[in-house]
Amino acid sequence: MSICCAIRSVSYTHLDVYKRQDYTYYPEILRPSTGFPAQLPVLLSEYHFYDRKDVEDYLTLLSLIPSCFDSVLDYETNKINEGLFLSDTQADTLIADLNTFCDNSSEHYLITTFRNKVAELPDLTAEEQASYYIENEAAFREYVLPAYEALRDFLVEHKGSGSNSAGLCYFPDGSDYYAALVYDATGSSHSIDELLEMTEKQRKSDLLAINGIAASHPGISLTTDDFPMKDATPEEMLTCLSSAITKDFLPPVSTDFSVRSVDSCMQDSMAPAFYLTAPIDNISHNVIYINPRSHYEGFELFTTLAHEGFPGHLYQTTTTSASGCAPIRSILNYPGYVEGWATYVEMLSYSYAGLPEEKASLLMHNQSALLSLYATADLSIHAKGWTLSDLKDFLSDYGIDNKEAVSEIYDYIVAEPAHYLKYYIGCLEFLQLKDYAKETFGDSYSDKQFHQAVLSIGPAPFDIVKKYLRDYYRQTI
């Protein structure tokens, strides 16, 4: 059986789970960071113009946004009728974000980015460019802005219709839905209890390593003032990473990339950083966004760029494409593989930063332990019914006592179920795959071949990656 057939078989099996229970109105498309309203403006701003037809198609697309938002409102109305509407806390967050988006309409970045892209088209006259500028601004004010305002007004009107401000397990059939969601998000076949056990085991291992380093290096700390690239630009860091990774990875495919800042009107609702997946017909068009609101700089920016760039998302996307992965697979979404890979290699990047080995190891284990706390919280809030009080008790055991910060963590996990799991559980699955490869190939094992093999397989549930790992590994020899 080919890998495409195997993926199709698993996908149909997974769909059967959803068919057995009607989970139609359980998903929330208005999630604060990863939901439709937050993601759409970025996709529109990155809609690439190769010729005038692309410009005209884009303007036509804007005219369809009101009907798209009408469908969103219909869906949310049905969620209200099913007793599955979002909580007041989530509604307040979304309303604030939508207000920010709408209040920046005088010189909105969807207007300015359009102008910049049109200005770069060489076959347009100045008059034609000016005409398109006018059309776009009119379309923004006629279609885009009213759609976002209608969504905001809907949330204001229906705030209070939600019945659950805690985990998914408090909804009818919520525990079963969460289990299905976890599989969808992670690609891991392990049960909820097994995932909790895996997470705790890795956390204990990381904390043991931290204690060992601290004992053998008195006075060592988590500060990174000695990071040699603390004043480097993001582009300089990415160039450094593309060279440094070659001891563990094949050299990156020749490609272009750019680093951009999230616009001010979207900073509150966007992630600290993200890689925008390159188009399948222009795999060299790679864009990484940094959110200024996160205030990432120095070492933290370096590891973030490793996650988003080399050897993270950018490297994975371009390498998998160059390996001949069927383009049709790009329509399938396996976030556990994609984010798990980026988190796994982010941990490796600590050794590329030019810090003393013991300092790099301390920082890496500390970050891994921190991510494990979020994973345990996600699983426990949505599957075990943890309240805010339970989360406070859990995190206080690890020295996290800031009540406001803990409350924000709780609210975010409630609003974005399984979000942290695709990163952390995905990372653990890659670590388990590495252990399996070492055991299977013995003296012939190398990290470089392992990395190339899993990237050649491409995004898939982890059982499938493991099934095909032996064959793809041999092809790298």
Residue ranges of predicted features:
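N-terminal maturation segment of proteins
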Residues: M1-I477
